[in-house]
Each structure stands twice: as C-alpha cells, then as structure tokens.
A protein has these predicted regions:
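Juxtamembrane helix-capping/reentrant segments at transmembrane boundaries
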Residues: 69-85
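Alpha-helical transmembrane segments
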Residues: 38-53, 118
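Membrane-embedded catalytic cores of phosphoryl/pyrophosphoryl-handling enzymes
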Residues: 106, 112-205
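Core segments of transmembrane alpha-helices
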Residues: 84-97, 141-146, 194-195
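Membrane-water interface of transmembrane alpha-helices
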Residues: 52-65
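Membrane-interface helix termini and inter-helical loops of multi-pass transporters
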Residues: 29-38, 67-71, 99-108
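Short, Lys/Arg-rich, polar N-terminal cytosolic tail immediately upstream
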Residues: 1-4
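The first (N-terminal) embedded transmembrane alpha-helix
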Residues: 8-28
Length: 205
C-alpha cells in the first residue's frame, strides 16, 4: 500500500502538462530553429501555471475544507477542484500565451498552445464526467503525454523508445491505482483513452 501511494504521488497528474511541455521543448530545440535561451522562461512559466498555482489552490481548498484531502475521494470534491483548476489553468494560459508563446517560433508556439488548450479541455471534461462516473486522472495525464510523444514523432522521427517508456510507466501507475483500490480497470482504461484522444485530436484541429 505504501508503494502504491508513493507511485501515485510521484506520478501525480498535476505534473503531466509540465512533462508534455518539457518533452516538446527538448525535441523542438533539436529540430526547429529556436532561441534555446528562451526555453527556460517557457518552462518556468508553465511550471508556475500548471503546478504551483493548482497546488496553492488545492491547499486553499483544504484549508477552507472544500476538499478533505489531496486524494479527493468524494465526487463533489473532485468536480469542484477540477473546475477550479481548469479555470486557473485557462487564465494562466491567457497570461502565458500573451507574455511568452506569441514571442517565439511559430511552430513551437502552435505546439504549446494546442497542448495547453488540450489540457484545459481535458480537465474540464474530467470534471463533467466526475459528476456521474469516477475516472482515473492519473491515466488521463499519461494518455495525454503519450499522445504528445506520438505527435512529436512528426518533428523528431522515431521516438518509439520514449513512447514505450511512458506506456510502461502508465502500466506501473495503473497497477498502483488498482492495488490501492482507487479505480476499476474500466476507469483506468477510460482515463488513458480520454487523455490520449483529446490531446491527439487537438493537434489536428
């Protein structure tokens, strides 16, 4: 049980958007002419918007007892927290897009915008689904990251090795969530499928 909780914490879905952007920036630096000195600014802003702000919001909700724990086991807690965070990430996107994304290479800017919009949409859809059905947020995150890696193959060529690593990690996290009794298989599969499809489809909009 301790191991499964550790895995769930280390691979918390809050980190998924940042990981996607980090992978994108690493690949883009090698394939597109872009000022590498500006990459840290992007990563710092995304880290703040997708990790620091939602974390602070969750801590505030814990303090005000809108949620009982970080696990958010109750349906109402998950819906409320997801809606708040989708709004905060959306506002963060508007700020980041205006200050950073629009200043950079068009190809990189487009990729980052689509990833952000897909994340916002995924979180919002997850909040709506959570009204009626519990879904694995961890696997939504992993599904999204895997979709980003597949998308990046059009720029960097064969990234099969990286995709295999994240699919393997998805399996580890899924097993940990199952062992902890947090989700059924259907909830896990549905989460991965939803995260993957939303992120993948946004690229082709």
């Amino acid at each position: 049980m301790i191991f499964s909780k550790a895995i769930s914490t280390i691979f918390h879905p809050i980190f998924a958007p940042f990981v996607s952007v980090l992978l994108t920036c690493c690949v883009v630096q090698k394939t597109i002419i872009v000022d590498s000195c500006k990459i840290p600014n992007i990563l710092i802003s995304v880290f703040i918007v997708t990790i620091v702000v939602p974390l602070l919001a969750t801590l505030y909700m814990l303090k005000k007892k809108y949620v009982a724990s970080f696990e958010m086991k109750e349906k109402k807690e998950r819906v409320y927290a997801l809606r708040v965070n989708s709004l905060l990430i959306g506002l963060g996107y508007l700020f980041t897009n205006k200050i950073y994304f629009c200043q950079y290479n068009k190809d990189l800017s487009t990729l980052l915008k689509l990833e952000f919009l897909a994340v916002i949409f995924s979180v919002y859809i997850a909040s709506e689904i959570s009204k009626h059905y519990k879904i694995s947020l961890h696997l939504i995150g992993f599904g999204g990251v895997c979709a980003v890696i597949m998308r990046l193959t059009s720029l960097a060529g064969d990234l099969l090795w990286l995709l295999c690593i994240f699919i393997l990690l998805s399996g580890v996290v899924a097993s940990a969530r199952r062992y902890a009794g947090a989700h059924t298989r259907k909830q896990i599969y549905f989460g991965f499928f939803l995260g993957f499809v939303i992120q993948f489809l946004f690229f082709y909009l």
